[in-house]
Amino acid sequence: MYDTLFLDRDGVINVKLEGRYVTNFSEFVFIKDSDTAIRKLHKIFKRILVVTNQQGIGKGIMTENDLNILHQKMQRTLDPEINLIDKIYFCPCLEEKKCNCRKPKTGMLENAKIDFPDINIQQSFLVGDSNSDIIAGKNFGLNTIKVDENFTLNNWLKTIL
């Protein structure tokens, strides 16, 4: 069994919207087979955590409550009875703020290590679709996997089974 899987959200779990933000669950579309992949990954990882930049909150396009509702619906769609994702960390800050939580900085990962002190960094992975995801993961000492439309979360899963 692997330790912790950190997942970015937009572009890894769900389809990114071109030039705008996913602000509610009606706009949220799972990338092909990402939901199935998460269900399988849940069986081979000790925990799954999401780390996602959500500056739409900082821009006033959505609220933290909107985001929480979206994430609750995402969780219930993945499994109606249990949370397959153990915790979701998000940074609401604008990029210009240069805060510590916004990737490529490692604040969300540091918070996860505080919440789950037994995380074994060397046995953990971060899967992301952007350079900022990969930089954050590498700077924190995680194994990193970059996905895109041709190499998805589900494709990666097949390489580790």
Predicted feature locations:
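Substrate-recognition element of Asp-dependent hydrolases with the DxDx(T/V) motif
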Residues: 34, 38-71, 87-94, 137
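Asp-based, Mg2+/Mn2+-dependent phosphohydrolase catalytic module
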Residues: 65, 69-84, 96-126, 130-161
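Active-site neighborhood of HAD-like aspartate-dependent phosphohydrolases
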Residues: 1-49
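Histidine-centered beta-alpha loop that forms part of the nucleotide-sugar donor binding/catalytic region
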Residues: 16, 53, 149
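Active-site flanking residues adjacent to catalytic metal/cofactor-binding acidic residues
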Residues: 7-9, 52, 127-129
